[in-house]
Every structure is written in structure tokens, then in C-alpha cells.
């Protein structure tokens, strides 16, 4: 399905007050319609794959961003002081959660973790508000395969003095990421597994 302003206007506009379970069902459909593709692909890890999930097709979609913000906010521990993620995939996710948190009177700032330090100015790896040392940060990700991408964000945040003990992803490809996080003492949660997407993809007749 190709996104257009016309298709958005004709679609079922999701009310901002919809309950999280409803948003979760609608987000799954959106991921199947816009992000999930079958074919021959090579992942960022170098692994070949018979399918690909282009998360930005949904994380940058207006209704998708709203659903993501509300769903992930509901999964955050009550003592979360910030959300963060590795650029570029996590940028719209942490932003959506932060914006929604302000509307729900639970303001949580967002941090963006660079893959390489800036070559000018502060030369920082981490962009966003300065937090106190020991602040609890949850790392967010769009798709987890091996778990290595989000781990880079975890390492940068810990090096800056923050406490990180949890990673939350929109989709778990179930290719070792969850086991990896467990092995390094990180809690891991995913909104959907790849089985959820593939089953719904078939139900939608794609």
C-alpha cells in the first residue's frame, strides 16, 4: 500500500482518546500494510532475509506515531526519567513517546544517540536535555534482530552516567535479540513478534 494524503483522508481516523488495546490492533494492521515486505533482503547485520520491516513507514506516519507514543508510554516503568534510542530508526519513536507523555501529564524527555560523535561543537554522542547522573533511561527500538543496535545506545548512555536496564521494541524478529539482552542483564519487551506480523499479514490477504 502506498501512503498518500488522500488515503489518509479516506481512512479510519483514530481518535486520540482510543484505548491502548484498540491502538495496538490498528498499529499491527498499519505495520502489515506499510512496513512489512516479503522478498530477498540483506539486513544491517549482514544476514539474508526473506522479509524486511521498514519501520519508518509507520513511525513517521501521523496515526502510527500517535499509536506508538501511547502504546510505548503505557509500557514504561513509572520511574522512567527519559527515553532514548540510536539514530535514525529510533528518532521518531522517542519523539512520539515524549510528545504523548506531555499530553498525559507525565512529561518524559527524549534523547537521541548518535552512531558517531559530532565533529564540531560539543562533539557529543547524546542529543537532548541534560539529565542528572543516575537518571533512569529506557532504550526504544523499532525492530530488534540480534540486539546489537540498541546495545550501542545502552553503552553510550551508561558511559554518560545514566542507568539503563530495559529495552522496548516495536517488533522482535525473534533472531536472538531477546536472548542476547537476557545474557547481559537487560529486561526486554516487544509490542509485536514477527509471528504476529506474519499471521496478520496473511489474514489481510497480502
From Swiss-Prot:
Q: Does the keyword Nucleotide-binding apply?
A: no
Pathway membership, UniProt: Pyrimidine metabolism; UMP biosynthesis via de novo pathway; UMP from orotate: step 1/2
Name the cofactor(s).
Mg(2+)
- Superkingdom, according to UniProt? Bacteria
An example molecular function term from Gene Ontology annotations: orotate phosphoribosyltransferase activity
For this protein, what is the EC number? 2.4.2.10
- Positions with a binding annotation for 5-phospho-alpha-D-ribose 1-diphosphate: 114-115, 118, 120, 141-149
List the catalytic activities from the record. orotidine 5'-phosphate + diphosphate = orotate + 5-phospho-alpha-D-ribose 1-diphosphate
| Keywords attached to this entry | Glycosyltransferase, Magnesium, Pyrimidine biosynthesis, Transferase
Q: What subunit structure does UniProt give? A: Homodimer.
Function according to Swiss-Prot or TrEMBL? Catalyzes the transfer of a ribosyl phosphate group from 5-phosphoribose 1-diphosphate to orotate, leading to the formation of orotidine monophosphate (OMP).
NCBIfam families, per database record: pyrE
**Family of this protein:** Belongs to the purine/pyrimidine phosphoribosyltransferase family. PyrE subfamily.
Name the UniProt record assigns to this protein: Orotate phosphoribosyltransferase
Whose protein is this, by species? Nostoc sp. (strain PCC 7120 / SAG 25.82 / UTEX 2576)
